[in-house]
Design a protein with these regions (language model features):
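Glycine-rich anion/phosphate-binding loop at the beta-strand->alpha-helix junction
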Residues: 36-54
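Structural motif
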Residues: 3-5, 30-34, 74, 82-85, ...
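Short acidic, glycine/serine/threonine-rich loops at helix termini
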Residues: 16-20, 26, 43-48, 121-126, ...
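Conserved thiamine diphosphate
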Residues: 49-101
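Short, hinge-like loop/turn segments at secondary-structure boundaries
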Residues: 24, 49-53, 102, 127-130
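Thiamine diphosphate
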Residues: 1-42, 97
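Short acidic/glycine-rich loop or secondary-structure boundary segments that cap or lie
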Residues: 42-44, 93-95, 111, 118-122, ...
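Flexible, low-complexity linker and terminal segments
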Residues: 116-196
């Protein structure tokens, strides 16, 4: 058995390669997808990414981003990932626990990891020193338990941290494919409802 870990950014994981993310989730392929979400194309000169908040400066939105931003975890859940979690570089111990739990899950494990980009997002949006960028992330996050207790109005602009979705019943793609292969070899009738 191989344990595949794919690391992407918010740009390549949700825009340029977003189709791969969506169909990996849909099929529930047994891999671990760590999306490093710093809210901007940080390594390619600061373009707007799918998670860039409204109003933020980028080189492709020099008067402020007008695009609505994605919630990567909602996308992964809706697309069919069987394990979805969000963590932050501010809480490395909790992030490690999420990785341990997700890596042992049999199916598509998606991790949205909020990370700072103090130069291309922070400085260029006048957030101040690097620590201010971390404080900005901290101010936009809370535990899932606390998030669930907030009113709809209080939830606006806040992201829950922790395991957000887990489906232990959904069959992993290669196991479903193997069942079809075995049934075809023995001329058995395939019950496709069991493979969902």
């Amino acid at each position: 058995d191989k344990h595949v870990i794919v690391v992407t950014g918010d740009g390549d994981g949700l825009a340029i390669g977003g189709n791969h993310t969506i169909h990996g989730c849909r099929r529930n392929i047994g891999l671990n997808h760590i999306l490093i979400n710093n809210f901007i194309y940080a390594l390619t000169n600061s373009q707007t990414s799918p998670t860039t908040p409204k109003g933020m400066w980028t080189v492709t939105a020099q008067y402020g981003n007008i695009d609505p931003s994605f919630d990567a975890c909602k996308l992964a859940t809706a697309a069919g990932a069987s394990f979805v979690a969000r963590g932050s570089v501010i809480e490395p111990e909790k992030l490690t626990k999420l990785f341990v739990e997700g890596f042992s899950h049999d199916g598509y494990s998606f991790f949205d990891v909020f990370s700072n980009c103090h130069i291309n997002l922070g400085r260029k949006n006048k957030m101040g020193e690097a620590v201010k960028n971390l404080e900005w992330i901290k101010g936009r996050t809370t535990s899932k338990v606390k998030f669930d207790m907030l009113s709809d109005e209080e939830k606006k602009g806040i992201f829950p941290l922790g395991v957000l979705h887990k489906d232990e019943e959904k069959i992993e793609y290669t196991k479903a494919y193997d069942k079809v292969r075995r049934a075809a070899m023995s001329n058995e009738v395939i019950n496709f409802e069991e493979l969902v």
